[in-house]
A protein has these predicted regions:
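FAD cofactor-binding and catalytic pocket of flavoenzymes
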Residues: 85-114, 118, 142-146, 314-437, ...
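Conserved redox-cofactor binding core of oxidoreductases
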Residues: 58-88, 92-104, 109, 119-124, ...
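A glycine-rich dinucleotide-binding beta-alpha-beta segment and adjacent secondary-structure elements
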Residues: 92, 204-211, 219-226, 256, ...
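A conserved FAD-binding loop/helix module that cradles the flavin
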Residues: 522-541
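Glycine-rich loop(s) and the adjacent beta-strand/alpha-helix scaffold that form part
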Residues: 27, 31, 38-58, 249, ...
Length: 548
């Protein structure tokens, strides 16, 4: 291993993309310094599932694990959308202001990034979703096709230990998933009968959670705590997969709590260093022979813009921001469903995932058993959200109905528009004086049309499955929840309308690369993006340094 002052590449961000890039470079014999603004998490210590608030708390916070962002004013809500209004029977309407609620940016800073918090869905993109401009006239094409990415999907799935079914429609595979699919939960089987009645294909969701022991990690025990952190290491978060594998090579140094404030550029065509801030206010300069940015679609453009607009010759840094659309509908079933048993989000329908699968709009969606996304983990949340009233009658209703809930979710395509972007807040700064990211997120009419379809299909599936009373519904129409974000440093062949080329390298700076979802030209039809980010990062890591 080279000394701390001598490495081949510096990677900023130890989450989905940065971890995979580090592993890919180390596999090639290169030495890597992997920086992250956040802390390390210890699964045994930091992810307790036995505390009294286990069913109401979110992913645990540690010092430095939550970044700060600001939001532009929310979009005004126009018209009446009864299927899209967010709220519950117990708590009432979520939004009453008349404008879209910009709740938060769901992002974890730390070694492993937001994969520490994610449910663990592991999806490949629909091949047609990579050709949105040439085939459907919207968004932009990826500068390569699915066949180019497929070997890197395989490499990522193999390291993670993805468990999935033998067939996933248009997503052809050169070989099967590494592990067999997880058994479907009781609730998923109930929804499966409803799907069959509607003529829909309902199958096991492909998951980055082990169905069998894999590479020294244990199989999932179905505790249901994926979003609160996996204490066993069976969920395929980046810390226990790619970071661990990179460290095992002896060629990777990991430095948590190291926020990068600025990038220094040289006179020619290379960046030279990054500046890292320390809690005492001192600034450290770290040389970077190759610099890979993997901070995500919000923080990567912030870093570039805060570095005097580095890599923004096209004016596209921060533009084309996309946040996938989401609908979650909860209903009560006459029979107990034990909705929190089994693997969260364990079943899925891809029938409407192709870009032209939804009548009247371009851009697809997927429908799934939203047992994890609903965050209805225990009795406390159920009593608050599913049952109205007070006193003894309320308690009796909770006792009678607990365990009878079903949730169906839909996640759909987000198309870029010029009103959705990430820029620098002119007034708000972090402790080092760096402007915060400011998110502007806007829905156009096609997004709202897609949401209407998603909400209607979710309710249709619940009804076909025997559910009789809807008690809550949430949608992106009135609520920005940052489900998955993409697109602010788009890749493409034309340097006038993109930030990086097909390899992930910036058009202007030969040693500046990006390996996160900011490079996505399109979002896909509701696929979870982590596996595609892994694959892209492995592909980019294969190219770094080969033509210097």
């Amino acid at each position: 291993m080279k000394s701390d002052a001598d490495w081949d590449a510096v990677i900023v961000g130890a989450g989905t993309g940065g971890a995979a890039a580090a592993y890919g470079l180390c596999q090639r014999g290169m030495s890597v310094l992997l920086l992250d603004a956040g802390p390390r998490f210890d699964p045994v210590v930091d992810y307790p599932l036995t505390e009294s608030n286990w069913d109401t708390r979110d992913f645990p916070e540690k010092a430095g694990s939550v970044g700060s962002v600001t939001f532009a004013p929310g979009q005004k809500l126009i018209g009446v959308e009864p299927l899209l209004v967010s709220g519950s029977k117990g708590l009432g309407l979520l939004v009453t202001s008349g404008t879209r609620w910009m709740e938060k940016y769901h992002h974890v800073r730390g070694i492993g990034g937001t994969t520490l918090h994610f449910t663990g869905e592991s999806h490949r993109l629909h091949p047609d979703a990579m050709k949105m401009k040439s085939r459907f006239g919207v968004a932009a094409d990826w500068p390569f096709d699915y066949a180019e990415l497929e070997p890197f999907y395989m490499r990522a799935e193999e390291l993670i230990g993805v468990a999935g079914p033998p067939f996933q429609g248009a997503r052809w595979r050169s070989r099967g998933f590494p592990l067999p699919p997880h058994p479907l939960s009781y609730a998923a089987r109930t929804l499966g009968r409803g799907a069959a009645a509607l003529g829909l294909d309902w199958q096991a969701n492909s998951r980055a959670a082990l169905s069998l022991p894999w590479h020294g990690r244990p199989n999932c025990n179905y505790c249901g705590g994926c979003n609160m952190g996996c204490p066993r290491g069976d969920k395929g978060s980046a810390d226990v997969t790619f970071v661990a594998a990179a460290l095992a090579t002896g060629r990777c140094i990991v430095r948590p709590n190291s926020p990068v404030l600025r990038i220094e550029a040289g006179i020619g065509d290379r960046v030279t260093a990054v500046l890292v801030g320390h809690p005492d206010g001192t600034i450290e300069r770290i040389p970077s022979p190759h610099l890979i940015l993997a901070c995500g679609a919000v923080e990567t453009p912030r870093l570039l813009l805060a570095s005097d607009g580095l890599a923004n010759e096209s004016g596209e840094v921060g533009q084309n921001f996309m946040d996938t659309l989401e609908v979650i509908v909860g209903a009560l079933h006459p029979d107990p469903q034990h909705g929190r048993r089994g693997l969260p989000d364990d079943a899925i329908c891809w029938d409407f995932n192709a870009p032209d699968a939804i009548p009247g709009v371009i851009g697809g969606c997927r429908i799934f058993n939203a047992s994890g996304e609903n965050e209805l983990r225990g009795l406390s949340g159920f009593a608050l959200r599913a049952v109205s009233g007070w006193g003894r009658a309320h308690a009796q209703s909770v006792r009678r109905l607990w365990g009878h809930s079903l949730h169906v979710g839909a996640i759909g395509e987000s198309l870029p528009n010029r009103n959705s972007r990430v820029d620098l807040d002119p007034d708000q700064h972090d402790q080092f004086g760096i402007p915060l990211s400011r998110i502007s997120a806007w829905l156009d009419e096609s997004d709202i049309g897609r949401l209407r379809f998603m909400a209607a299909k979710s309710r249709e599936l619940l009804a076909a499955s025997g559910a009789q009373e809807i008690f809550e519904s949430y949608s992106s129409w009135d609520w920005f929840g940052a489900t998955h974000v993409f697109g602010t440093c788009r890749m493409g062949a034309d340097p006038t309308i993109s930030v990086v080329n097909a390899a992930g390298r910036n058009h202007r700076w030969r040693n500046l690369w990006i390996t996160d979802a900011s490079v996505f030209p399109s979002s896909g039809g509701g696929e979870a993006p982590s596996l595609t980010i892994h694959a892209l990062s492995l592909r980019t890591a294969d190219k770094i340094g080969k033509d210097d």
